[in-house]
């Protein structure tokens, strides 16, 4: 990868489109940005959908205490649709174009090609962190059995979960990360936002263990950095999706 390939685009939006993030934010705009960050943090939307599902008698666990794959798929895809809809509404309300925020001035095909080797980089980061934790801080391995592994024990469930990790993982989370980083440009800067968003991303994976949360938080920072340098979500989406799919393949092959 050359330095030229990874050079960030020039500041400013597309011709004729106001560069909202570059404007000096007013106090009111900061308050609005904070509200949008909270609403698009994933916690409110998932809580609302989970409550709605429960009201209709559709609960996450079966009578035997196992996590329902149907619930996870339905919640993840519904949350993806709701969250993307919210972000598009907020962008429209501020006169921002989704293409400018999510794709920038980069062409899609070259960005997708860049994302492929970044899958390997993401794998290296994940392996290095987990190996370091296992060597120097084994107490952080707080979950012996990842509960999500039970969702992919059959070919049908594996395919369903693959859909989830691509659509709700790779696509939704990278669009969400880009939107939140954009809003943090009004709330202390993108670098500050990268730290906050990465910590929140890691915290969302505590169900899988503290070590997994550290690894995923670091990976979130990596993908966020790629977005900030490229101003396009395409490479992070490809890298994130590929990383998730390889994790499924790993479990199917070696069983852990």
Predicted feature locations:
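N-terminal, membrane-interfacial amphipathic/helix-forming hydrophobic leader that caps
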Residues: 1-102, 109-110, 135-136, 248-256
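Transmembrane helix-loop-helix hairpins at the membrane interface
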Residues: 16-19, 123-127, 135-256
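Alpha-helical transmembrane segments of multipass membrane proteins
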Residues: 41-49, 79-83, 118-130, 223, ...
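Juxtamembrane helix-loop-helix connectors linking adjacent transmembrane helices
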Residues: 52-74, 95-168, 186
